[in-house]
Amino acid sequence: MKVRYVGKSYGVDSMTDGKVYEVLEVDTMVGALRIVDDSGEDYLYHPKAPKPNGAKEAYGRYEIVEDDASGSLRKAIFG
């Protein structure tokens, strides 16, 4: 699964506007996407309001590039 982040760039350890990121899983227990970000590590990000840890406001949104057969990303982001 893959998403494109659209919004304010966070810096070298988070996400960059327009870049496509791999989503390792949709964690339904905590309601988050596990994404490999610019740091090269995987972190949990809110599916509807992506922001770096500790930030007070969301900076952007996701566009789905590639979903699984069950539509897991669509459900998490738009559902």
Spans of features found by a protein language model:
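Basic/aromatic-rich interaction segments and small domains that mediate binding to polyanionic partners
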Residues: K2-K56
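Intrinsically disordered, low-complexity, charged/polar segments
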Residues: Y43-G79
